[in-house]
């Protein structure tokens, strides 16, 4: 008998399993596909690998403006694919080693349940006391006319490409769609983005969004918003105004939906619209001893959110005091150029219930940014006026996804803008912009 069986080996599942084993629980992980889940195999990791290649090319082009003659004679995509695969294999091996080290049983196969909630994998019954569902999600394909006639890619299949397309059309304007546009264009691919909503990146700060849109324009990435798609042909997406966006590869990146096969077998209660598994504050489902986390329960569909939720689950069934993950404390990252990172309340949300101070400090006023030719972007902190509580923050710029954690750490420890302003930042660093921003909020700025 297992104390805990985890279904799914993504960032939510494998982290939870290891933590449970470390707490003395006999634990097993069941995985139908590849260890590491979507994040490791078809998401966060392979996309960052390609974005790194794109960044190297952009850096070489930038160097040419400042006296270094770097020629991009040829581009070996096969080597890029090889490197991406090596990174994935290294991380997969790392998870397997962690399972061995912590005595977590890893079972490959499809989990299924009978009417008595008995668990079977590969025809073998597996007994459990607690069950954690970390089954993840799959690409959502919208009902587009004749889309089934096109040989389209999803984010689950995009990284299987062995040759670069000449022209890539992406239906979708969210984080994944935009990141992949940034990854492909520097590699010589013509990229078209098609978004049916009023704008791309609608979940991002409005100023950050405009910064990224400006960069897309500079890169000559074709962006269509408020698009009305009439149909999809073999080699083109046809819009209602007659415009055709041609492609030799079509990617549909319109979000993901929860994998609900296992919850349905277990007859678990879903949310009001039937899209996600309903859970309580300890991530327990409608049935005792069965928990669910990550993409299956809604909220931010992010790897680190799933991991944090999984750790809360383990703490709960081990008898510890726990509390749900605060959605306002989850960092959100966009790996474009410049990067965008944020957490907490946005400007409009903050204004609804607080008297707020909103200021921003541009990287164009930062010495390291100027020396590094990385002056795009800014640091913005949204704070409450009376006690200077940090309500949210946005960083747009080089290394923004690393820098956001400085502000988040102060917020997590219940620090205020004053305490953030008191930090001695090394000079010259991009992080000094955080200190300048904090000091400007309390009217103590030197350079702002």
Predicted features and spans:
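A Rossmann-like FAD-binding core segment of flavoenzymes
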Residues: 108, 112-120, 126, 187-281
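Glycine-rich dinucleotide-binding loop and its adjacent helix/turn
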Residues: 44, 135-189, 194, 266-267, ...
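N-terminal Rossmann-like dinucleotide/flavin-binding domain of flavoprotein oxidoreductases
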Residues: 41-42, 46-125, 202-227, 234-235, ...
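N-terminal Rossmann-like FAD-binding beta1-loop-alpha1 element of flavoenzymes
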Residues: 2-29, 177-186
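Rossmann-like dinucleotide-binding cores of NAD(P)H-dependent redox enzymes
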Residues: 81, 86-92, 159-160, 165-169, ...
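Short hydrophobic core segments
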Residues: 5-7, 111, 126-136, 171, ...
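Flexible, glycine-rich terminal cap/loop adjacent to redox cofactors
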Residues: 7-10, 21-33, 38, 45, ...
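FAD-site-proximal beta/loop scaffold in flavoenzymes
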Residues: 148-164, 245-317
């Amino acid at each position: 008998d297992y104390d805990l069986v985890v279904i799914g080996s993504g960032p939510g599942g494998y982290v939870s399993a290891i933590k449970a084993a470390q707490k003395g629980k006999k634990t097993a992980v069941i995985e139908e596909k590849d260890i590491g889940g979507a994040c490791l195999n078809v998401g966060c990791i392979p996309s960052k690998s390609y974005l790194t290649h794109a960044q190297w090319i952009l850096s070489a082009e930038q160097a040419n403006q400042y006296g270094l003659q770097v020629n991009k004679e040829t581009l070996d995509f096969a080597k890029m694919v090889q490197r991406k695969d090596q990174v994935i294999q290294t991380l997969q091996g790392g998870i397997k080693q962690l399972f061995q080290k912590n005595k977590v049983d890893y079972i490959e196969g499809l989990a299924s349940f009978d009417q008595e909630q008995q668990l079977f994998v590969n025809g073998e019954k597996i007994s459990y006391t607690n069950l954690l569902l970390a089954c993840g999600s799959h690409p959502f394909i919208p009902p587009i006319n004749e889309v089934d006639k096109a040989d389209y890619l999803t984010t689950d299949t995009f990284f299987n490409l062995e040759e670069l397309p000449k022209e890539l059309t992406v239906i979708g304007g969210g984080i994944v769609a935009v990141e992949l546009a940034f990854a492909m264009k520097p590699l010589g691919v013509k990229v078209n983005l098609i978004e049916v909503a009023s704008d791309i990146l609608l979940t991002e700060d409005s100023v950050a969004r405009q910064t990224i849109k400006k960069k897309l324009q500079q890169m000559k990435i074709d962006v269509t918003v408020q698009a009305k798609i009439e149909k999809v042909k073999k080699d083109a997406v046809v819009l209602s105004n007659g415009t055709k966006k041609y492609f030799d590869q079509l990617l549909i990146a319109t979000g993901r939906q929860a994998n609900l096969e296992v919850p349905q077998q277990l007859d678990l209660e879903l949310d009001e619209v039937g899209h996600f598994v309903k859970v309580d504050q300890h991530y327990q489902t409608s049935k005792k001893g069965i928990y669910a986390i990550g993409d299956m329960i809604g909220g931010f569909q992010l790897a680190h959110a799933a991991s944090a939720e999984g750790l809360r689950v383990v703490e709960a069934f081990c008898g510890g005091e726990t509390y749900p993950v605060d959605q306002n404390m989850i960092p959100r990252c966009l790996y474009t150029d410049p990067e965008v990172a944020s957490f907490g309340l946005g400007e409009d949300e903050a204004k609804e219930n607080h008297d707020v101070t909103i200021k921003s400090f541009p990287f164009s006023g930062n010495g390291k940014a100027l020396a590094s030719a990385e002056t795009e972007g800014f640091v913005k902190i949204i704070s409450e006026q009376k006690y200077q509580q940090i309500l949210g923050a946005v960083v747009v710029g080089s290394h923004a996804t690393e820098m956001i954690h400085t502000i988040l750490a102060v917020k997590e420890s219940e620090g205020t803008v004053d305490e953030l302003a008191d930090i001695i930042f090394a000079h010259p660093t991009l992080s000094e912009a955080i200190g300048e921003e904090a000091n400007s909020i309390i009217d103590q700025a030197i350079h702002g």
